[in-house]
Amino acid sequence: MARISFSYLCPASWYFTVPTVSPFLRQRVAFLGLFFISCLLLLMLIIDFRHWSASLPRDRQYERYLARVGELEATDTEDPNLNYGLVVDCGSSGSRIFVYFWPRHNGNPHDLLDIKQMRDRNSQPVVKKIKPGISAMADTPEHASDYLRPLLSFAAAHVPVKKHKETPLYILCTAGMRLLPERKQLAILADLVKDLPLEFDFLFSQSQAEVISGKQEGVYAWIGINFVLGRFDHEDESDAEATQELAAGRRRTVGILDMGGASLQIAYEVPTSTSVLPAKQEEAAKILLAEFNLGCDVQHTEHVYRVYVTTFLGFGGNFARQRYEDLVLNETLNKNRLLGQKTGLSPDNPFLDPCLPVGLTDVVERNSQVLHVRGRGDWVSCGAMLSPLLARSNTSQASLNGIYQSPIDFNNSEFYGFSEFFYCTEDVLRIGGRYHGPTFAKAAQDYCGMAWSVLTQRFKNGLFSSHADEHRLKYQCFKSAWMYQVLHEGFHFPYDYPNLRTAQLVYDREVQWTLGAILYKTRFLPLRDLRQEGVRQAHGSWFRLSFVYNHYLFFACILVVLLAIFLYLLRLRRIHHRQTRASAPLDLLWLEEVVPMMGVQVGP
C-alpha cells in the first residue's frame, strides 16, 4: 500500500528565526560588564573613604565643642556611670575643696580619663574655701580634722551618697605647710588620717594626705593646662596650630609661665635626650626635671613626659617691688652719706623713681628709715635698674638667680602666661592674648610717660579694665618693666617670640593645679574598667574596624562573584562549541533530504 505525505506551506511572513549570538560577542559583553562593575565599585569605595576620612576631624572638633559646652552645664548626679573625686588644696592663706567627676573610661588604654569639675544645679563650680590656712593648726594638730570638716561636709552633700565609698579623697598641702617643721607637718596629717574616715565614707588612706613640693605643684599645673587644651589627645589632629609634633603621633605641649605676688614659676616639656652637661649642671638638671607617665599602662609610652619646672621665691610682682624699694632706699641713703646730699629725705627733694608714673608721689618706709619718691615715668631706665634683681650668672644655660634652665626650642614651642603676665598686658594696656614684645614695650613706655593726674582721670572715665584698681594704676609701670625683664633677660625669650599667649581663663574657665593632681593620682583607674569590659571591648574593636574593612571585604566578595560568572560563561562557551561540532553531520544529512510537494505520491 502506497504512503501519501502532505506538506503545508505557510506564507514567508509567518516564519521567524532567533539569531544565534556569537560566542565572541558574548565574551566581550562579559568582559565589559566585569570592567564596568569593578570601576563603579572602586569609585564608590574611594568616594566613601574620602567622605569618612574628611568627616573625622569635623566630628572630633564638634565632639570637643559639645564637651566644652557640656562642662558649663549642671552635673547629672542621677547618672550611675559617673565617678567622683575630691581634692583639698591646703594653701597658706586658706583651704579649698574641688569636686571632680568623670564618666566610665572609653576602653582605649591610650586615652586618659575625661575629668571635669562638678557643677551644681545653678551650673556653678562646686568649690568651697575656708580661712585661715591649715598651718594655723600647727600648735593644735588634734583639731586638724575639725578644721576640714566644713569642706568635706560640703562635698558630701554634692556627691551622691551611693558613690561616697568609691570616691577618692586627696588632701594636698602647699606653701603654708612647707614652712612648718616636719614634726608638726606629720602631726597634722596623722590627725587627718585617723579621724576623717570615722566621719566620712570617702576612699581615703594615709598616702592620700601629703605635703607636696613646689616642683610637684608646678607639674600638676602643667598637666592641668595641657589637659584642658587637649594636648594629651594624640589622635585628634583637627587643630592645625596644635598639631605640630615633637615625635610621630605626639602633639606639642605648651609651657606655662605664672607670676604671682610672691613667686614666679616656669614649666615646659623638654626632649628625652639632652646634651651632655658638666657634673654640677647634670645634678641641677636632675633636681629640676620631672619624668612621669600619665597613661594607665606602664608599657605604653605615648603619655610619658619629661618636664622642667622651677619656682623662684621672691620673684613675684609684689615681692619684686619690695626688693626694688629696698635697693633704692639703701643706694640713695649710702649716696647721701658719701656725697652729703639729702635726696629723698623730704617731700621737697624726693628721689625721682623711673618706675612710677610721672608726678606720682609715694613714701618708702623700712624700720625707722623713710624715703620720699616721685615718679618720672622712664620705662627704659626702670628696666635697667631692675636688671641686677634678676641675679643672673655668666653661664648661657642659667636663668634667674643663676639656676640651671633646660634649653627651649623657640622655633617649635608654645607658652601660656598667667596671673601677672595677663594683668600687665590686659588690665590697663588692653593688649592681652597673643604677646608681641615690641608692641608691649611701646604700650608700657607710653603708659609710664603719662601724668598721674591723666591716668586717674582715665580710670574714673572707665577706660581701663573692670579688674583694674588704684594699686594696678600705681605699680603698672614697675610690674610691666619687671615682667619684660624676667621674660626676655631672665628666661632668654626672643623679643619677637610669637607663641606666647597671656590668659586668665582657658576656654572660659579657670584651671587649677588640682585638676592636674587628680589626673595624675587617678591615672591607673582605667585599668579597672578595662578588665571589666574586656569582652565588650573585643566586640567593640571588631565593629570599629569593620567600619573600614567591611568595604574591602564587600569589594573582594563582588570580585569573587564576578569571577565565578566569568568562569561560568566560559564553561557555557565550551559546551556550545562541542554541541556545534556534534550537530554538524546531522545538518548535512538534513540538507540532503527532499521535501515532497503536497499531493505527490512517493513510491515504496
Swiss-Prot record:
Active site per database record: 217 (proton acceptor)
Catalytic activity, as annotated: a ribonucleoside 5'-triphosphate + H2O = a ribonucleoside 5'-diphosphate + phosphate + H(+); UTP + H2O = UDP + phosphate + H(+); GTP + H2O = GDP + phosphate + H(+); CTP + H2O = CDP + phosphate + H(+)
Glycosylated residues, chain numbering: 330
Cytoplasmic-side segments: 1-28, 568-604
Disulfide bond annotation, renumbered to this chain: 448-477
Catalytic activity, EC: 3.6.1.15
Vesicular side: 50-546
GO cellular component: cytoplasmic vesicle membrane; endocytic vesicle membrane; Golgi apparatus; membrane
InterPro entries: GDA1_CD39_NTPase
Pfam families: GDA1_CD39
Main location: membrane
Calcium found in the keyword field: yes
Compartments where found: Cytoplasmic vesicle membrane
Record field: transmembrane: 29-49, 547-567
Family, similarity comment: Belongs to the GDA1/CD39 NTPase family.
Protein name: Ectonucleoside triphosphate diphosphohydrolase 7
Organism per entry: Homo sapiens
